Amino acid sequence: CTPIEDNPFHLLKWTNPTALMKFYPEGKDTEVFEKNSYIPMKNDMRGGSQVIKYKDGYLTLIHETDLYKSEQGNKNATYRHRFVYWDKEFKNQKFSKIFSFLNMKIEFCCGLAQYHDDFLITFGAQDNAAYILRAPISFVEEFINE
């Protein structure tokens, strides 16, 4: 589950279909709200960055995992990413095209923040290196709206 900026005790449980979870600390209960229907896609959308408030809605960066067996029969995977933007009610969403940061099999985004006119994106590669990427907001918006 992923925290949602400006929504205390709310988490993004699923991206597709969008499902939010609210935690009630007094009773230690949770409630799940489904916001939209499943959109058929090749791979499952999984975790990534937290969900940040952006313009009139919310933005996150997720990864998709293409699972397969290696030549030796071992479980293997390739990770690719998408930006996902929702309106303020989490009803309508836009997906960017799928992409890779470094064209490596194992990549995992773990942070997204707005900093002036840029987004700062933190990610790991090959389970042994960490990076921070500074991307202009205008570039990300074009990428989402292609």
Language-model segments: what does each one mean?
Residues 1-3, 49-51, 110-112:
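Hydrophobic core register within WD40 beta-propeller blades
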Residues 2-43, 53-105, 123-146:
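Beta-rich carbohydrate-recognition and catalytic domains
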Residues 104-113, 117:
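A short, acidic, amphipathic alpha-helical segment used as a generic capping/interface helix at domain edges
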